[in-house]
């Protein structure tokens, strides 16, 4: 059985607050193959690492991420919701993440955007990847195909992954999609993965990276099918089982 790479979903979020520097450090300590994280743009145009469109759920603040500057987001308490020991952990910038991680693992950057035209994260993310020479290390994913299309046109060397959680989206089935923008990877929700999907993806030349798998039995099923990446909240558990 071919062993898939295991990515820490939002860092090691079971033992440290998700999408914070401590969670990413603990993921590195587990020797994961990769880390998955989410990015938004702050009020002052910086890429910041947080999952939701608001800060309400994972910090002591209230409001939309885009209404805070990066400095204001850094000053929030993004850790106490898990444990008081992480109270000093704020919302990091993507630059701070890469300062910590360096080239020690692969990175899946998911662009969060409610904008049907793709959002304002594309240009600064492309600039960061170019400046830090991250082409081989980073894959950019999104549920929004327009976001990925903007990425492709802005810099065709950047690796892309299309997220989806139901049956194959129409824009993947249509003939125009492949010549315009075929992603390097498909990121389907794990319950829909079967032999048919794997065969289709491999025939298209796409890797299959799946999320969010926390059950060992399910991880073994996916590994047997030949998925390339398994993203998990418990990467240490999944790695030990495989």
Residue ranges and their predicted role:
Residues 1-242:
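Phosphate-group recognition and catalysis centered on beta-loop-alpha active-site segments
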């Amino acid at each position: 059985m071919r062993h898939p790479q295991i990515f820490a979903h939002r860092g090691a979020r079971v033992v440290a607050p998700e999408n914070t520097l401590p969670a990413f450090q603990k993921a590195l300590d587990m020797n994961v193959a990769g880390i998955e994280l989410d990015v938004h743009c702050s009020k002052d145009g910086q890429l910041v690492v947080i999952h939701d469109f608001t800060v309400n759920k994972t910090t002591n603040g209230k409001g939309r991420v885009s209404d805070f500057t990066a400095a204001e987001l850094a000053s929030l308490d993004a850790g106490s919701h898990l444990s008081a020991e992480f109270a000093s952990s704020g919302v990091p910038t993507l630059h701070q993440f890469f300062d910590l991680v360096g080239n020690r693992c692969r990175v899946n950057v998911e662009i969060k955007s409610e904008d049907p035209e793709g959002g304002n994260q594309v240009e600064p993310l492309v600039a960061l990847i170019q400046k830090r020479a991250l082409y081989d290390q980073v894959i950019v994913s999104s549920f929004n195909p327009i976001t990925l299309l903007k990425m492709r046109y802005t810099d065709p060397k950047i690796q892309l992954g299309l997220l989806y959680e139901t049956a194959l989206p129409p824009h993947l089935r249509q003939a125009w999609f492949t010549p315009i923008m075929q992603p390097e990877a498909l990121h389907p929700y794990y319950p829909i993965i079967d032999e048919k999907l794997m065969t289709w993806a491999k025939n298209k030349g796409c890797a299959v990276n799946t999320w969010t798998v926390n059950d060992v039995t399910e991880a073994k099923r996916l590994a047997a099918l030949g998925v390339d990446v398994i993203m998990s909240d418990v990467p240490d558990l999944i790695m030990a089982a495989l």
